From Swiss-Prot:
<keyword id="KW-1133">Transmembrane helix</keyword>
<protein>
    <recommendedName>
        <fullName>Flotillin-like protein FloA</fullName>
    </recommendedName>
</protein>
<keyword id="KW-1003">Cell membrane</keyword>
<dbReference type="GO" id="GO:0005886">
    <property type="term" value="C:plasma membrane"/>
</dbReference>
<comment type="function">
    <text>Found in functional membrane microdomains (FMM) that may be equivalent to eukaryotic membrane rafts. FMMs are highly dynamic and increase in number as cells age. Flotillins are thought to be important factors in membrane fluidity.</text>
</comment>
<keyword id="KW-0812">Transmembrane</keyword>
<dbReference type="GO" id="GO:0045121">
    <property type="term" value="C:membrane raft"/>
</dbReference>
<comment type="similarity">
    <text>Belongs to the flotillin-like FloA family.</text>
</comment>
<dbReference type="InterPro" id="IPR022853">
    <property type="entry name" value="FloA"/>
</dbReference>
<dbReference type="Pfam" id="PF12127">
    <property type="entry name" value="FloA"/>
</dbReference>
<comment type="subunit">
    <text>Homooligomerizes.</text>
</comment>
<feature type="transmembrane region" description="Helical">
    <location>
        <begin position="27"/>
        <end position="47"/>
    </location>
</feature>
<keyword id="KW-0472">Membrane</keyword>
<feature type="transmembrane region" description="Helical">
    <location>
        <begin position="5"/>
        <end position="25"/>
    </location>
</feature>
Length: 331
């Protein structure tokens, strides 16, 4: 009975040891590496575990690299993994570059990957150029007609400028700027419609791929259309603005004229008041002149006759004026 218990304990210890071994040490992965001809020790895999590296993320790309004939070491791949890179994508990019006869070292490829670029896509774009389609870009010719153009840009990745080079947005913006300036320098929008290739040729000569991660191979105008008559719209807006300014100035002059008229009316009333005041003093002056003997009775009577004649003339002229006005109205 004690022998059986000891055997059971021994078997349990062996089972636990094997479970820990197969859990902590990827024996299956080690066997796969040996079968693929990759020289890697079991203790190297244990060291990866201790360094918190997932062995499969390093060993499987290493197997692919060795089978593709690449000279890569475990330490390089492990270092790239610890730096936060994508080891599998880097190895795939190196294999694709080797097949396409592109000179690309592991250090360069790892730097591109750590910079946040998709290095595999970049290698594929170096072999198979990518077409970038811009939205409709509007420009105004010198005759005031708006012209809208859509372009297709064929680019190839420039691996040497992937780190620090501008992306697709910069290429689209520069091409759009070139299209706008080319349309704007045209004397007539009809010339742009007749020869749209002049836009692509002019833009392509400007070297818009400088400082970008791409090499522009061609720029083709995919579609071109006529927009609004911007020149006529601007002239209409200017005429409307001039009209409003003239109306404002006329209103200002009218207000000044009304104010001047009111001022003159006030002056007329003021003068009339002075006349009435002066006329009120006339009887007093006559009375004083008669009292002091400065004026005789005959002089006073002559004065009365003159005033009567004046009133009569005023009445006659007023009646004549009213009659002429009635005759004009009858006509």
């Amino acid at each position: 009975m004690p022998v059986d218990l000891g055997l059971i304990i021994l078997l349990g210890v062996i089972f636990i040891a094997l479970a820990v071994l197969f859990t902590f040490v990827p024996v299956g992965l080690w066997i796969s590496a040996l079968a693929a001809g990759v020289k890697i020790g079991i203790f190297e895999l244990v060291g990866m575990r201790l360094r918190r590296v997932i062995p499969r993320r390093v060993v499987e790309p290493l197997i692919k690299a060795v089978k593709a004939g690449l000279d890569l070491s475990t330490s390089k791949l492990e270092g790239h993994y610890l730096a936060g890179g994508n080891v599998d994508r880097v190895v795939n990019a190196l294999i694709a570059a080797q097949r396409a006869n592109i000179d690309l070292s592991f250090e360069r490829c790892a730097a591109i990957d750590l910079a946040g670029r998709d290095v595999l896509q970049a290698v594929q774009m170096s072999v198979n150029p990518k077409v970038i389609e811009t939205p409709f870009i509007a420009g105004v010719a010198m005759d005031g007609i708006e012209v809208k153009a859509k372009a297709r840009i064929t680019v190839r990745a420039n691996i040497d400028r992937l780190v620090g080079g501008a992306g697709e947005e910069t290429v689209i913006a520069r091409v759009g700027e070139g299209i706008v300036s080319t349309i704007g320098s045209s004397d007539d929008h009809k010339k742009v419609l007749e020869n749209p290739d002049t836009i692509s040729q002019t833009v392509l000569k400007k070297g818009l791929d400088a400082g970008t991660a791409f090499e522009i191979l061609s720029i083709d105008i995919a579609d071109i259309d006529i927009g609004k008559n911007i020149g006529a719209g601007l002239q209409t807006d200017q005429a409307e603005a001039d009209k409003k300014i003239a109306q404002a100035k006329a209103e200002e002059r009218r207000a000044m004229a009304v104010a001047k008229e009111q001022e003159m009316r006030a002056k007329v009333e003021e003068m009339r008041a002075k006349v009435v005041e002066a006329e009120a003093e006339v009887p007093m002056a006559l009375s004083d002149a008669l009292r002091k003997g400065n004026m005789g009775v005959m002089d006073y009577l002559n004065y009365q006759n003159v005033m009567a004649d004046t009133d009569m003339r005023d009445s006659i002229s007023k009646a004549t004026g009213d009659q002429e006005a009635d005759e004009k109205n009858d006509r």
